[in-house]
Amino acid sequence: MASTSNLLDVVRHYQRSIEKHGEDEQRLLHCITKLFNLPIKFEHLQETGIGKTVNALRKISGEVGVAAKTLVTKWKAMVAKEDPSIASTPTAIHNEEDSGKTKSSDEDPDQENKGGNSSSGEDLNTSKHKSKHAKSTKHERSSSSRSHSKSRSDSDKKHKSSRHDKSKDRDKDREGQKEAKEHKEKKSNGEHKSKDSSKSSSSHKSSKSESHKSEHTKSKHEKDKTSHSELKEVKDKSSKHKSSSSKSSKRSHSPPRHEEESQKAKIPKVKSKSEEDSADGFDSSMGANFDDVLGLLNIPISSKKSSSNSKSKFVAKPTAAPSSSALSAPTTAGSSKEALSTSSRPTSKKPELLASTAKLEPLDPNIALELPTISNNYKPMPLNQTVMDVVFNQGGSHKAQASRYFNESEALAQGISSKTMRTKIYSGVRTGQILQVPSLFDLCTRVLQKNIDALEYTGGVPFEVLRPVLERATPQQLLNFEEYNPYLMDDSDVLWQQHVQRHCRSQRREEMETWREMFLRCQEEKDRKLSILAESIKASQKISEAPVRKTQLAFVDSMVKPPRSVQRKQEQYGTKGKLIATPAARVAALSSVTPNAAKVGDARLRVLAAARDTAQVGAGPARSKKAPLMAKTLQFMRGRLKR
């Protein structure tokens, strides 16, 4: 109990914080995150009203609205798990409607075949009327005093006894027929319905207390299945039923009028009791939907179905109410015909699915959780860490998600996410990707960055506007741009500092020197060094060039010696002649005769390298040149012979 009270205090603390800091987005996100992690139950939502407070935050755009929607979805799932009767209420009401139709269809052939069983039909109609009357006064019974219940039970007892005395003899003869009829009702309506019908059929012989107990239990059972919206429709239908019963009671005597007056007296009490219940708060036994707890304006689907069921129930009621005086046979036959006609009316209606507003069963809570909330204005998911944890991690609900199977869409999303989680291999920066719509300033900046060479005089645009463009410029482009716009030199020193640190790291700035002047000085030194280096390279290239080839004459000033073999033969055969004068001596002799003769060193005496002096060199035997392949083969053979 202490932990529950502590949890309620924590929830109320965050509720007050949300109401107090309605404009602080960070505070609201903090409170929603804390509420998401708390183990809040349905009774906590009822006592504190935090559901209505958080539901009001869904209208806020942005991260707060998304987080509030997620928290409301979680609470809806929690309520659906804790109280499944709320989700199953429409189907139970639908089953009641079907069983009511089968019950009326089972009673119709009995009324056709047994025209004389007027008293038994009247008893069944009165028991039905009592049960419907008990449904309309269900809230009044639980809170009314004992004196009021005694007076009402006494009047009911008198009314029952007057009818019981007249139909006593007929009931004895037709007990077997009633048992067969009860057997049919068991087959059509089930065990629960047959118990109620058997109690209503045996109420003539039972005491006043037993009938009161059966009505009280039935009213409790119906109370669990009806909501606050159904009660209003029951009031409207009961007022319509009063008018129809008053018309039919004109034919009979005063007891039905007395019954109508009692109903009129009870309906305001029911209304006051229902207002008290709604003021006290929502009760789980009332069948209130989770949307009612959150204070939404929309009405649950179960109320529509219950209203249609109540309409069919009131249509199936007999219009002729039984009177205390004995009714004649024609009157009973007419009442049975009216009951037949009224019971056959619902069957002639169109099926519910073919109606203009088809009534479908509500979605399964698990499916409703997976569906996104419908919005006319689509907004992308905000990239806030708190919201992402709430939406994707779902707090501490990992175990619940692991137990269930994935559907096709979830399995596909899981496969894609696992593929993106793999190790990525760097393959360069992706260019040309625009992840978001650029602004006009960004578009203009990109165009100027691509066309820096075309920029000239700007007309006095501030430096901060042009800075993204000038940061992409080279030093030469920046110099040209400053020539057209000298006013930028005062602010562009930051850009020149970047160029100096990039190109001239080893240099130091002199005193009272700007970064622009330092860059220009370093550039001049670099150019001078380059020019000196270029000149030295050119000079070395001139020196290293190959000299011009010169052809020199051999044996110009000396005698030409014959080869040794020739010299031996000349000595052997005695053919050794006089030594021939040297070429130089011959030239000198000729120069004395002819002054135009060439002297030593004259260019005319130069002989080409390829030219051969056939007179000086004896004609030896010409050797035939061997082919390269043959020469190689012979060399190989000589090498083998040497081995």
Swiss-Prot record:
Primary role: SIII, also known as elongin, is a general transcription elongation factor that increases the RNA polymerase II transcription elongation past template-encoded arresting sites. Subunit A is transcriptionally active and its transcription activity is strongly enhanced by binding to the dimeric complex of the SIII regulatory subunits B and C (elongin BC complex). May play an important role in metamorphosis.
Region described as Activation domain: spans on this chain: 413-571
Localization: Nucleus
Comp. bias intervals (Polar residues): 114-124
Keywords: Developmental protein, Nucleus, Phosphoprotein, Transcription, Transcription regulation
Composition bias type Basic and acidic residues, residue spans: 94-106, 164-198, 207-237
Region (Interacting with Elongin BC complex) location: 439-448
Positions of disulphide bridges: none
Region (Disordered): 86-289, 302-351
Modified-residue entries (Phosphoserine), positions: S120
Gene that this polypeptide is encoded by: EloA
GO aspect biological process, one term: transcription elongation by RNA polymerase II
InterPro entries: Elongin-A_domain, RNA_pol_II_trans_fac_SIII_A, TFIIS/CRSP70_N_sub, TFIIS/LEDGF_dom_sf, TFIIS_N
Xref: Pfam families: Elongin_A, Med26
Record remark on domains: The elongin BC complex binding domain is also known as BC-box with the consensus [APST]-L-x(3)-C-x(3)-[AILV].
Domain TFIIS N-terminal: 9-82
Bias type Basic residues, positions: 127-136, 238-255
Segments of skewed composition (Low complexity): 302-336
Protein name: Transcription elongation factor B polypeptide 3
One GO CC term on file: elongin complex
